[in-house]
């Protein structure tokens, strides 16, 4: 049985903060998350959040026993049963939270429902929705029929804003934390010079939920020894020490999100992390170069969605962009290249939630393929 994250005692921390656990639901290998040296099932961690949401809703509207529940078209996972596993886990958690009548509804379709509700007079029969959120990239193609619609195709891949944030962390932060630096230390009869083994730190730094596990001697000892030797690059390892000791990865990712948002409206922005005395300027052009490979995946997934619908790009009347990452100018550019003059932006951060509420009110259901 695999446990996600090293089984080390984290009793010195005030708590463990988890984000993006939805991304783990479809991974059969991820069965437990460690909290204060105790393994918790994913379902056990998700249930209290869902219970709190239900109770908050009931405080305003009364008893809630059923709901339309959003999910990505394809959960992240390693096999063909990832969606089945994820929906089973999610359904179990909702059940424990008191939501017994469950109607799973794909998130891009929910976003499209929200758009059509707000824009009933929008012209066009065929609508394509791109929902580019934090963890997944989802698509749907709908055909409008009066006041109703039919689902022509859905598609989704495991790519989201969180993946772009990790790329920025690697490209911008790693060189400033000691990657590529030399490590000189005294051997038995001579001085030994090697590259500092930064690769051992990389995955834990960019997965901030488990960055705290770097507070073990196997990681901290070489960092402190490298600082003690002095010389060029010492400040970089002092930064690495501070990131580890003060568990700063989450804070840095928050600053990266701010940087990314700024580059959606201006050509140059600054990543400012005063906690480790670091400022890095980044141009939109360089940002787009860094995320060139994910952008290619976006383009390929977009074209695959149109192909699955049995359509050509010219057959699409309305192209709806939603989700925070849809605001990235390069993503907008991909849409405009293929659907010039037909791209609209809609409520990037709450369209899915609004659409789920509307779909539930109207009794809209989605039959699982």
Stretch-by-stretch model annotation:
Residues 9-129, 232-285:
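Nucleotide/phosphate-binding catalytic cleft detector across ATP-hydrolyzing
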Residues 13-14, 117-150, 321:
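Gly/Thr-rich phosphate-binding beta-strand-loop-beta motif of the actin/hexokinase/Hsp70
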Residues 53-67, 299-317:
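Phosphate/pyrophosphate-binding loops at sites that engage ATP/ADP/AMP, CoA/4′-phosphopantetheine
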Residues 71-72, 318-325:
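Glycine-rich beta-strand-to-loop/alpha-helix junction loops that act as flexible
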Residues 97-105, 314, 332-357:
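Conserved phosphate-binding/catalytic loops in two-lobed NTP-binding clefts
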Residues 121-130, 179, 361-369:
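A polyampholytic, Gly/Pro-enriched intrinsically disordered region
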Residues 144-275:
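Phosphate-binding glycine-rich/basic clefts of nucleotide- and phosphate-handling proteins
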Residues 297, 301-314, 327-341:
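ATP-binding/phosphotransfer module of carbohydrate and carboxylate kinases, centering on a glycine-rich
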